Amino acid sequence: MPKLIPVADPLSKPFWDAVHQRRLVLQHSAHCDRLQYPPQQACQVCNSAAGLTWKEVDGKGHIAASIVIEDGRLNRRMPDQPYNLAMVTLDADKRVNFYSNLPGTPPYKVPVGAAVEVAFEEVAPGQLIHEWRVAA
């Protein structure tokens, strides 16, 4: 399945720089001890911008929910249909979610509740993205 190549902006650059090093980092608020994704100018909870830093997390989570896209007419960049769309809840902070098509997991075979791990996939020479795969 073809993947979009992300273009980092000043706010997301630390995230994508870490992905290129095969690491997962998230913004962390020192004021309320919360992780957040996607990156924002201020904490989603306490609205502090001064206390935001980047924190490495272990990249483990669980599948919270899943659907199968069978006819994504509006999404022509995903020609391989049907495909999974799973919501992954991060173990390090259950309030942080990611979305993934779970490469390697066939449509309709997503084990909701299963453990997943972040994986890094090369989508162009020298260009990595983060994905989630069901843990072995």
Predicted regions and their residues:
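Cys/His-enriched microdomains
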Residues: 27-30, 41-44, 111
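A broadly conserved sequence feature marking short terminus-proximal activation segments
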Residues: 1-26, 133-135
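Well-ordered alpha/beta subsegment
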Residues: 93, 98-136
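Short functional micro-motifs and their immediate structural scaffolds
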Residues: 37, 51-53
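Residue-level marker of beta-strand positions
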Residues: 60-62, 115
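Glycine-rich active-site loops that engage anionic ligands at enzyme catalytic sites
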Residues: 63-103
